[in-house]
Amino acid sequence: FLAARFGEWMSHKIYTFVSDGSIQEEISQGAGRVAGHLGLHNLIMFYDANNIQLSTKVDEVDTEDIEMKYKAWNWNVISINGNNAQEIYNALENANKETKRPTIIIGKTTMGIGCLDANGGSMESKVSTHGQPLSNAGVCIPSTIKNLGGNPEDPFVIFDEVKELYAKRKKELIDWAAKKKAEQAAWEKQNPELAEKLKTFFSGEAPKIDY
């Protein structure tokens, strides 16, 4: 919409994150059909498919084939192990190359992955871990932190490799933002009338309507 009116410098991706409950909502069905029909290729939706909802497991109440449904709606469908960082990265790379259709990345995930109870038993894929603090669901927080590779005595420590990763990414994003701002400034200088029109789009003011 924006790129068609104001140029390719406005071309960007829109990311949405949905859960099993979200994907079941009727409003999402209509939105999905429209997005596929219009070929909204700048839309990338990540679906956290953990088969858990508020009171039951999803497969107890729903037998839909989500992958086939979105394919029928003209979506680019990518199914991955949503607990695997490399698969997520690869899926996002592929989704950003799509130029004809919206993309849904179906990430098959495990609710409460790595969580343990006080006896060391697994709390993964438990309906009780949905919608409330894990401790209220019977998860032993210290045991879980240790199981996930952390230190229960210092649970909020930031590992050095994480600091390095985010510092590198921060630099990349600062450079990217500077480039986009320069593109915008050049476009505004060359297209003053459209630049004013764009400002009205984000001004929060209602358009004037001739009744």
Annotate the PLM regions.
Residues F1-Y15, K163-Y211:
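Thiamine diphosphate
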Residues F1-K168:
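Glycine-rich ThDP/TPP pyrophosphate-binding loop and its adjacent helix/strand module
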